[in-house]
């Protein structure tokens, strides 16, 4: 039997190796230097600290003002708001682009889309695009695999499907470092996929597919229950891998139109359909965190929650809320690039609010840093590790941030100042509302989705804003009196461009023969039962819209 002093030493050693900073323990060690020496000798042979699991949760089309924790006045609070209260909520969180495909490529790689090549005449990968995220790009999944992590993904991909045939799956997630790929949307949820009869009589089977890993399992797909499929797959992955470090990427179809929710959440939010969708996503996130707690790994798991870009404001009440920020999806105004950004790590990250600049591209560098691996040095990373920002409250590693639209540099932020070289036309929400009926969108459109052309204005000298005093970008500053700021902007852009090697444009190579089709003899429809219908609470709104509908 071990003696009591020996057991005491073992317990004390455990406290030291866990990096405990208890004052009583520190006083004991100061008063007993021989004990400290013994502990340190034993400590040389201790096991390394456990690598934290990393969970990345990405919402689609969610604006910076959609969550209660970010100030929405009518949205009910949910579990994501609890994470914001108990974790670190950032007010200056940014994404690498204001549109789905390029933004997601930046999340996966830590690099601006202009470096990767995820731009072109079109803005996103389409089902008939032959290209996808280049295999030469290291993804966060591949980086974490190199660090010894199991890797899993569920939900929306939107980084390419096929290359040479309708079934080769050349660009799907399993080819980019994910060991496990559950139910996933290789393209996206869209207006065309509506199966309720709200926007479409019948969903477009040429755009709407549900896969499991590389297998097409439903075309089109049922919206009802989709979030539950993603969530169940995520829970299964956690259960199967909880004993070892893992990286899990959950890319929700919420909050992209067409909106949908299961019966448990329909007609439950005072905010309407958008609120119902958000409550369903809150529930999914809570189930994921509950599973971590059930397996006693919540305190060894860091969770990032972000959106892929700002809201689609032309969709009115179904498009999301950019809060005080101007613009939305596809825009280089703050409303397009600034997002909710929450990091949650119980017991490690102190609760609080941070005004430091952080980006979606920082996640890969931070995860690699925490996982004990390094990223390649043969390329430029726009993302930086924010480990010290999270754990120590340090200043952001970013002194600047670049806003691109395709391969056009639209604006740059330097400190608190933002200089626009080009701006897209943005109308007031009231004007967008004229294209809606009772808040219900009548058409699938963008007022200005361009990076140059008639709805884009060039500025020379640049249009300058102080984002600390004027985050809504309403009051441009005079050049006179800000000469030093303009010089800093100029030198920052020159340095950036001097090191920039643009990627080859990837979004304009098309071949309609590669579009997924599970059953050509049946109009590419399989495992789908069309049951149009909508909850009663939506019917008055839809009836109002029908009276105003313009084909």
Curated annotation (Swiss-Prot):
Ca(2+) binds at residues 60-61, 100, 308-309. Its EC number is 3.1.6.1. Its cofactor is Ca(2+). Binds 1 Ca(2+) ion per subunit. The conversion to 3-oxoalanine (also known as C-formylglycine, FGly), of a serine or cysteine residue in prokaryotes and of a cysteine residue in eukaryotes, is critical for catalytic activity. Glycans are attached at residues 164, 213, 296. The modification Blocked amino end (Gln) is found at residue 21. Its main location: cytoplasm. One of its GO terms (cellular component) is cytoplasm. Residues 1-20 form the signal peptide. It comes from the Eukaryota. Keywords: Calcium, Cytoplasm, Extracellular matrix, Glycoprotein, Hydrolase, Metal-binding, Secreted, Signal. SUPFAM superfamilies: Alkaline phosphatase-like. GO terms for molecular function: arylsulfatase activity; metal ion binding. The modification 3-oxoalanine (Cys) is found at residue 100. Gene3D superfamilies: 3.30.1120.10, Alkaline Phosphatase, subunit A. It is an enzyme of class 3 (hydrolase). Belongs to the sulfatase family. This is Arylsulfatase. It comes from Hemicentrotus pulcherrimus (Sea urchin). The lineage of its organism: Eukaryota, Metazoa, Echinodermata, Eleutherozoa, Echinozoa.
């Amino acid at each position: 039997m071990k003696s009591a002093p020996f057991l005491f030493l073992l317990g004390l050693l455990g406290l030291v190796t866990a990096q405990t900073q208890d004052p009583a323990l520190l006083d004991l060690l100061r008063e007993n230097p021989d004990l400290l020496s013994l502990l340190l000798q034993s400590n040389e042979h201790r096991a390394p600290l456990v690598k934290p699991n990393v969970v990345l949760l990405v919402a689609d089309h969610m604006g910076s003002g959609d969550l209660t924790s970010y100030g929405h006045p009518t949205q009910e609070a949910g579990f994501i708001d609890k994470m914001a209260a108990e974790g670190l909520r950032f007010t200056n969180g940014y994404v690498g682009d204001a549109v789905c495909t390029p933004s997601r490529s930046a999340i996966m790689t830590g690099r601006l889309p202009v470096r990767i090549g995820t731009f072109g005449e079109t803005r996103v990968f389409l089902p008939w695009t032959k290209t996808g995220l280049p295999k030469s790009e290291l993804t966060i999944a591949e980086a974490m695999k190199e660090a010894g992590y199991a890797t899993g993904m569920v939900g929306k991909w939107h980084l390419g499907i096929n290359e040479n045939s309708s079934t080769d799956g050349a660009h799907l997630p399993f080819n980019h470092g994910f060991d496990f790929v559950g139910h996933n949307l290789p393209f996206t949820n869209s207006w065309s996929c509506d199966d309720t009869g709200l926007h479409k009589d019948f969903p477009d089977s040429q755009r709407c597919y549900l896969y499991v890993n590389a297998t097409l399992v439903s075309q089109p797909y049922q919206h009802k229950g989709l979030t539950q499929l993603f969530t169940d797959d995520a829970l299964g992955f956690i259960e199967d891998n909880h004993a070892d470090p893992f990286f899990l990427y959950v890319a929700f179809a919420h909050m992209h139109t067409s909106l949908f929710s299961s019966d448990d959440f329909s007609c439950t939010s005072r905010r309407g359909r958008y609120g119902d969708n958000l409550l369903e996503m809150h529930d999914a996130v809570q189930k994921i965190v509950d599973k971590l707690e059930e397996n006693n790994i919540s305190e060894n798991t860091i969770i990032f929650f972000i959106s892929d870009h700002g809201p689609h404001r032309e969709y009115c009440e179904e498009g999301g809320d950019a809060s005080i920020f101007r613009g939305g999806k596809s825009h280089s105004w703050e409303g397009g690039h600034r997002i909710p950004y929450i990091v949650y790590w119980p017991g490690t990250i102190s609760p609080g609010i941070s005004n430091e600049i952080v980006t979606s591209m920082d996640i890969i560098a931070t995860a690699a840093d925490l996982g004990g691996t390094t990223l390649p040095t043969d390329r430029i990373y726009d993302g930086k590790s924010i480990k010290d920002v999270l754990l120590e409250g340090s200043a952001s590693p970013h002194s600047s941030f670049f806003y691109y639209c395709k391969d056009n540099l639209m604006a740059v932020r330097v400190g608190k100042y933002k200089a626009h070289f080009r701006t897209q036309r943005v109308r007031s929400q009231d004007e967008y509302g004229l294209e809606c009926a009772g808040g219900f969108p009548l058409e699938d459109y963008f007022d200005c989705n361009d990076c140059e052309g008639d709805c884009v204005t060039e500025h020379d000298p640049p249009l300058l804003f102080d984002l600390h005093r004027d985050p809504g970008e309403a009051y441009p500053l005079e050049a006179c009196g800000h000469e030093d700021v303009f010089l800093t902007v100029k030198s920052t852009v020159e340095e950036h461009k001097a090191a920039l090697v643009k990627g080859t444009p990837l979004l304009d190579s098309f071949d309609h023969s590669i579009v997924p089709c599970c059953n050509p003899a049946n109009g590419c429809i399989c495992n789908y039962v069309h049951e149009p219908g909508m909850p009663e609470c939506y019917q008055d709104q839809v009836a109002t819209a029908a009276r105003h509908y313009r084909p």
